[in-house]
């Protein structure tokens, strides 16, 4: 069985919950990524921060990106999978919560991220279409 650990992007860097939105955006630009996990002072996952969050929930909401922090934009709910999760379990989490990336946890620590592209490489073509439709429904685009 293929697991999250098998297909994840390891070596993921967290943005600290006290880091500014500007610092997070600069890191995203430098590393050509669209999302970062938010970790607290306890090194545990507190949420995810996307480039879209910075624009919609930060800038468009009038927050100052030089003083507003990643932690302020952390979502109330944290969606993740265990490192031993199957592809189906990952699909279920991503589809249910309409997210394109899901952090991978092992022993309460962040060990990687699985993206929609990582999963798509392990699905038959007909399943890819269904998966993309499920995570890109109008509800996902409106939130």
Curated annotation (Swiss-Prot):
Changing residue 14 to A: Forms less stable dimer. One of its GO terms (cellular component) is extracellular region. Zn(2+) 2 binds at residue 122. Keywords: CBS domain, Disulfide bond, Metal-binding, Repeat, Secreted, Zinc. Gene3D superfamilies: CBS-domain. Residues 8-65, 73-131 form the CBS domain. Its main location: secreted. Disulfide bonds join 14-39. InterPro entries: CBS_dom, CBS_dom_sf, Diverse_CBS-Domain. GO terms for molecular function: metal ion binding. It comes from the Bacteria. GO terms for biological process: response to hypoxia; symbiont-mediated perturbation of host immune response. It is found in: Secreted. Zn(2+) 1 binds at residue 97. Induction: A member of the dormancy regulon. Induced in response to reduced oxygen tension (hypoxia), low levels of nitric oxide (NO) and carbon monoxide (CO). It is hoped that this regulon will give insight into the latent, or dormant phase of infection. Following a shift from stationary to anaerobic growth this protein is not seen to not be further induced (at protein level). Induced in mouse lungs at the same time that adaptive host immunity induces bacterial growth arrest; induction is dependent on interferon gamma. In plasmid DNA-vaccinated mice, subsequent challenge with this protein induces positive levels of antigen-specific IFN-gamma and IL-2, indicating this might be a good vaccine candidate. Has been detected extracellularly but no signal sequence is predicted by bioinformatic programs. Homodimer. Forms an SDS-resistant dimer that requires Cys-136 for SDS-resistance. Unlike some other CBS-domain containing proteins does not seem to bind AMP. This is Hypoxic response protein 1.
């Amino acid at each position: 069985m293929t697991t999250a650990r098998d297909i994840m992007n390891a070596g993921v860097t967290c943005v600290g919950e006290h880091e500014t939105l500007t610092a997070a955006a600069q890191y995203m630009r430098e590393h050509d990524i669209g999302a970062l996990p938010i970790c607290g002072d306890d090194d545990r996952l507190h949420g995810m921060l996307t480039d879209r969050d910075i624009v919609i929930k930060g800038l468009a909401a009038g927050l100052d990106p030089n003083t507003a922090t990643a932690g302020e934009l952390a979502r109330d709910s944290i969606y993740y999978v265990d490192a031993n999760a199957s592809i189906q379990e990952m699909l279920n989490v991503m589809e249910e919560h309409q997210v394109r990336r899901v952090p991978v946890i092992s022993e309460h620590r962040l060990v990687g991220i699985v993206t929609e592209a990582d999963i798509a490489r392990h699905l038959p073509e007909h399943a890819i279409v269904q998966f993309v439709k499920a995570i890109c429904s109008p509800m996902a685009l409106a939130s």
